[in-house]
Amino acid sequence: SDPWKAFQGLAGKTIVLTINSKPEKTGSRDILIKPEDGEQTLRYRAWIENNRKKVDAATNGKVGYIYVPSTGIDGQTDLYMQFMGQLEKEALIIDERFNSGGQIPDRFIELLNRKLYNYWARNGFEDWHTPFIGHFGPKVMLINGWSGSGGDAFPAYFKAAGLGKLVGKRTWGGLVGISGAPGLIDGGYVTAPSFGYRELNGELGIEGYGVDPDFDVENYPHELAKGNDQQLNKAIDLMLEALKNNPPKKPGKVKYPDKSK
């Protein structure tokens, strides 16, 4: 019989699953799970984790990897969660390939672009810095032709802020937006373009064109099928080179004055 038949209609619902190392009730235990309706989310998370492990192994733990799927709520959540977990990395690879957009990502750039003001010292403790949440090492961003809307703005702002180089392929080039969506009697709605991106000089700029990479790197399907991500490899090489040419510097221990004299 089909072992998955009992799970039909239960996707997204919390259920009790009885498990054991052998097919009998004795010694079994109950666990709570929420079944998925497909493998896409699991494969997506596995892809991110595999990329992170690859970067970690290739750089001896010096470089972090952050994937940003959108500039909407899920993208904000993923960026902040992964950023907080890798603050102590000496360099960061920001991967926004396939970024589906959402909101305008100015706050994303503010998080990545925080400047170091000072350190604080205390006897017997490690120094800490202001701002407390910030990464001050080199960065690089991965882009491709499936990144659009907010996924165009993110690398454009990243480059404008001087945060680092862009690696991959030119982005989609779609920053005309909509505002308001009149509802229809059948439950549908109507949208129409109502505003668009302009450069500081008044030109359309990346609208209809996209954001060019600094390093144009193609990812061929037959190489990806073998686990060979040339774009990610290039980003790793750039970060290792940046750390070699400009290793991170921290202040020495404070020499406290002798106030007894």
Where would I find each of the regions flagged by the language model?
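Short intrinsically disordered coil segments
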Residues: W47-N51, M81-F83, E207-D212, P251-V254
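Short, intrinsically disordered/low-complexity patches at protein termini
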Residues: Y117, W128-H129, V190, D214-D216, ...
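Cleft-lining beta-strand/loop regions that shape enzyme active-site pockets
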Residues: S1-I185, L224-N228, D237-N245
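Conserved functional hotspot residues or short segments at active or partner-binding sites
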Residues: E207, H222-K226, Q230, D237-K261
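Flexible glycine/proline-enriched surface loops and loop-helix/loop-strand junctions
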Residues: D216-H222
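Metal-dependent DNA phosphodiester-chemistry modules and their immediately adjacent helices/loops
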Residues: K53-K54, S147-S149, L184-D216
